[in-house]
C-alpha cells in the first residue's frame, strides 16, 4: 500500500520539524497546540526533527472538503464544522507517514531505515484484515466499503480527512458514513485508561445487567456530546 502511494506520487521523502506528542505519536504545528499542549490529550509536547516520508494530503483538500460539506459523510454536524474550521480552512498540510526514531513497526520495503507510521497501517487494517492485497482472506470485495465507522471524537480527523484522502489515492471506495461520538467524562475530564479514572463497565453490567447498562448509555447521552 505504501509503495503504491509512493509510485503514484502521493508519498515523497522530506524532513519533519515540529512539536511532538509522544503518547499520541503525533506531530503538531504551533498554531494547533492548546495552551502549548497536545490538542488531543492535553499532555506536554516537545520539539522534534527527523527525516520522513510524507503523504500529499494537501492534494486532496478540495475533494475532502466537498465530501464533508455534502452533509452525507460525517455526523453529527458539529464534527463537520470542527473538521472544516480547524483543519480544512487553515489549509491541510502534508502528513508525516514514516518514522526513523524507532525500529518496531512495518519497515518501508524500499527504504528499510524507515518504518510505516501507525496511521497508515492502522487505517488500512480495515481493508487488509479482509484480504486486500493479500491472499490470506477473500472477504474484502464482500464487505468493503464499510457501512459505518463509529469513532471517538479524538480520531474523527483521521477517519474523516486522512482516511478518505488515502482511499482516494488508492482508488478505493470510501466508507458510507462516519459517526464521531463524544467522551464519557468524570470530574470534568475524559475517562481514560491511562489516567486510571475509568468507571468499570463490567461491574456496572454485573450489578444492573448488560441490556440495562446499554439502555442507560443510549438514553442518557445525546449522541456526539460529551
Task: Please tell me what each predicted stretch does.
Residues 1-11, 25:
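N-terminal Rossmann-like or analogous alpha/beta NTP/dinucleotide-binding catalytic cores
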Residues 4, 20, 37, 95:
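The −1 position to Zn-ligating cysteines in a subset of zinc-ribbon hairpins
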Residues 14-27, 180:
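Short, glycine/charge-rich beta-strand/loop segments that flank catalytic centers
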Residues 17, 34-35:
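Short metal-coordination and nucleic-acid-contact micro-motifs, chiefly zinc-binding Cys/His arrays
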Residues 23, 41, 47-226:
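Structured secondary-structure scaffolds
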Residues 28, 45:
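Cys/His-rich microdomains that often coordinate metals
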Residues 29-34, 110:
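Short linker/helix segments within small regulatory modules
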Residues 35-36, 50:
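Predominantly a Rossmann-like dinucleotide-binding segment in NAD(P)-dependent oxidoreductases
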Amino acid at each position: 500500500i505504501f509503495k503504491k502511494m509512493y509510485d503514484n506520487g502521493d508519498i515523497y521523502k522530506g524532513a519533519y520539524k515540529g512539536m511532538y506528542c509522544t503518547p499520541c505519536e503525533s506531530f503538531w504545528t504551533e498554531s494547533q497546540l492548546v495552551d502549548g499542549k497536545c490538542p488531543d490529550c492535553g499532555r506536554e509536547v516537545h520539539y522534534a526533527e527527523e527525516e520522513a516520508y510524507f503523504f500529499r494530503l494537501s492534494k486532496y483538500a478540495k475533494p475532502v472538503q466537498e465530501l464533508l460539506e455534502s452533509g452525507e459523510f460525517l455526523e453529527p454536524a458539529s464534527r463537520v464544522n470542527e473538521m472544516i474550521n480547524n483543519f480544512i480552512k487553515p489549509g491541510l498540510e502534508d502528513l508525516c507517514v514514516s518514522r526513523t526514531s524507532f525500529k518496531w513497526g512495518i519497515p518501508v520495503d524500499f527504504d528499510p531505515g524507515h518504518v510505516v507510521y501507525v496511521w497508515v497501517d492502522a487505517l488500512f487494517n480495515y481493508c487488509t484484515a479482509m484480504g486486500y492485497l493479500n491472499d490470506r482472506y477473500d472477504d474484502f470485495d464482500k464487505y468493503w466499503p464499510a457501512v459505518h465507522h463509529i469513532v471517538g471524537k479524538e480520531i474523527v480527523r483521521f477517519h474523516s480527512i486522512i482516511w478518505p484522502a488515502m482511499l482516494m489515492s488508492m482508488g478505493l471506495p470510501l466508507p458510507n458514513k462516519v459517526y464521531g461520538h463524544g467522551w464519557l467524562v468524570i470530574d470534568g475530564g475524559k475517562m481514560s485508561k491511562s489516567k486510571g479514572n475509568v468507571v468499570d463497565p463490567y461491574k456496572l453490567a454485573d450489578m444492573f445487567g448488560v441490556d440495562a447498562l446499554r439502555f442507560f448509555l443510549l438514553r442518557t447521552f445525546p449522541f456526539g456530546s460529551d
